[in-house]
Amino acid sequence: MTAPTTRKDLMIVNMGPQHPSMHGVLRLIVTLDGEDVVDCEPILGYLHRGMEKIAENRTIIQYLPYVTRWDYLATMFTEAITINGPEQLGNIQVPKRASYIRVIMLELSRIASHLLWLGPFMADIGAQTPFFYIFRERELIYDLFEAATGMRMMHNFFRIGGVAADLPYGWINKCLDFCDYFLTGVAEYQKLITRNPLFLERVEGVGIIGGDEALNWGLSGPMLRASGIEWDLRKVDHYESYDEFDWQVQWQREGDSLARYLVRISEMTESIKIIQQALEGIPGGPYENLEIRRFDRLKDPEWNAFEYRFISKKPSPTFELSKQELYVRVEAPKGELGIFLIGDQSVFPWRWKIRPPGFINLQILPQLVKRMKLADIMTILGSIDIIMGEVDR
């Protein structure tokens, strides 16, 4: 009788691009030794649409509808970065009311993004209930967005010098009611998930990143803060009106998937804190800076002459980008979202380089999944929080 032989060959498995846990068209070529991951190679580019090249032959106002297609779950941040760059190049002052409205919208968008991270992340590791729960709160946020901007997603709401429209009557009270309700929702999530032994078994000690390692890989956002680095661009860069509110940077030391979950859950309650303060202290005044004289134009142009530039909804395509370069960044839900902008005394940018947080955070995935089990790939990938529209651009 022949003795049974055990095969020692490695197995190569394709995960994606059509896979429910890939969060978009990501493809992983995984090399397995039984259940153990030997190697993992991400294949990107299935959703590449040439966003940087498109920007080079569009005015800023023409390009705004495109940018909401990068990270389509946190569109306010892509709009914010698109108008912050030209505002800094043109030295344009934003009215205080507009700045407060922007902060409110950005933080609501952060909560919506974190909610739609939490649901699929829990579904990936086998918990279906939170996946359905998160849509209750997310729908309420989208109702607020629809009332203020006219759109549930892809809002096209930010403008150079302010926002497209003022908050409608009764919106502030509606938003305050949502804030009170949402805090009970977060408490429910924590009760349901945080101490659940099955959940802890799947995430504790999985995908550990040390602080130095996170810095060396260029990680940002919750990925960096979960590794013990207290770094948040809202505190560091002092953009918009974040300095006027009382809030804390949320961070953890452990650097594993559980730490990344805890950072994002805590960030949602901090965002509510910021929104409540902004709603209660929102000043009066204009919501858009309509009359900006260009500083590099003639000294006293005629009122209706071509040199007098309005930076507003209607004539803003004539807004020229001065001949200088600038890197501008915001703290998006997934990390540091930045653009490197070069103006050329033209209405079109000469170069528009996008720094997407998801793309850079994803680079550490092969290192994290090596020597882990096949099932841990979903946990680790889910904890990174990627959107392929932003990764591929």
From Swiss-Prot:
EC number from the UniProt entry: 7.1.1.-
Query: Which PROSITE patterns does its entry note?
Result: COMPLEX1_49K (PS00535)
Q: Which GO terms describe its molecular function?
A: NAD binding; oxidoreductase activity, acting on NAD(P)H, quinone or similar compound as acceptor; quinone binding
Q: Does the keyword Signal apply?
A: no
Principal place where this protein is found?
Answer: plastid
- Is Secreted among the key words of this record? no
Q: Which domain of life is it from?
A: Eukaryota
Mode of membrane association? Peripheral membrane protein
What are its GO biological-process terms? photosynthesis, light reaction
- A GO CC term assigned to this protein in UniProt: chloroplast thylakoid membrane
Keywords annotated in UniProt: Chloroplast, Membrane, NAD, NADP, Plastid, Plastoquinone, Quinone, Thylakoid, Translocase, Transport
Binding partners and assembly: NDH is composed of at least 16 different subunits, 5 of which are encoded in the nucleus.
Family as reported in the entry's similarity comment:
Belongs to the complex I 49 kDa subunit family.
> How is this protein named in the record?
NAD(P)H-quinone oxidoreductase subunit H, chloroplastic
Organism field: Nicotiana tomentosiformis (Tobacco)
* Chain's gene name: ndhH
